[in-house]
Design a protein with these regions (language model features):
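Hydrophobic beta-strand scaffold residues
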Residues: 32-33, 70-72, 162
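Catalytic donor nucleotide-activated moiety binding site of glycosyltransferases and closely related
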Residues: 6-10, 148-190
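Well-ordered, non-membrane alpha-helical segments in soluble/globular domains
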Residues: 15-23, 53-59, 141-153
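Short, charged/polar "capping" segments at the starts of alpha-helices
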Residues: 11-18, 52-56, 81, 135-136, ...
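A donor-sugar binding/catalytic signature common to diverse glycosyltransferases
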Residues: 42, 187-200
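A nucleotide-sugar donor-handling region in carbohydrate enzymes
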Residues: 69-140
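Short loop/helix-cap segments at secondary-structure boundaries that form the rim of catalytic
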Residues: 37-40, 119-121, 172-181
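N-terminal pre-catalytic "stem/leader" segment of glycosyltransferase-like enzymes
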Residues: 1-51, 133-134
Length: 200
């Protein structure tokens, strides 16, 4: 298989993981072309967030997807940032194929993480934002508009306090003065936490 891998546009935290991923592909005998355009069978990129260093990944993504060829996407994990990683085909999260049909339950204990029960009650309704420069948000309104839509929909059903929390790397400017009992909590970067961000 001919693989086009692009570590050069990855964020700074991708270097080690990308290098190990390339090494694993080469070990299987695949022909891996690094940081150059070829007529590959598959491309490998880091994330589908078209921002900063990763902005150029969008061209690679579009070239392969328009040719109906797969794109392997590597991304930081959703559990412990920079200690767990996602690897999927044609996206991340719900749009992705993680090829995990045959994964057993022996991997979960390695995270040393305990699930807490889902809370059905509480004082606040929390609305969490996505990064609107991400392929995951493709076709959706800007984050400010989306937050307002969610607030208006929630207000049709309850007057409970609403807390709006944007994506840590996607600042917003939302005028909450026109809403009653709605607050904005900006994430604070904290490298001592599981996801480099506070959750308070």
């Amino acid at each position: 298989m001919k693989i086009e891998a692009w570590p050069m546009y990855g964020p700074l935290n991708s270097t080690d993981v990308f290098a190990k991923f390339i090494k694993s592909m080469q070990a299987t005998g695949d022909h891996v072309c690094i940081d150059r355009e070829t007529d590959g069978d598959v491309a490998v990129i880091w994330s589908v967030l078209w921002q900063g260093r990763m902005r150029k990944y969008k061209q690679i993504w579009e070239r392969y997807r328009q040719a109906n060829k797969p794109v392997i996407v590597i991304e930081v994990g959703g559990i412990r940032r920079n200690k767990s990683f996602k690897i999927a085909i044609n996206g991340v999260n719900r749009k992705a194929d993680f090829a995990n049909q045959d994964v057993d339950n022996t991997r979960w204990p390695l995270f040393n993480h305990v699930f807490k029960p889902w809370k059905q009650t509480g004082d606040n309704i929390l609305i969490l934002g996505q990064h609107d420069a991400s392929e995951q948000w493709n076709g959706m309104p800007g984050m400010n508009i989306w937050f307002e839509q969610q607030i208006n929909e929630i207000r049709k059903h309850t007057d409970r306090p609403i807390q709006v929390r944007p994506h840590p790397r996607n600042p917003i400017s939302l005028d909450l003065k026109k809403y009653k009992n709605v607050s904005l909590t900006r994430p604070i970067m904290d490298s001592n936490t599981i996801d480099d961000t506070n959750f308070k």
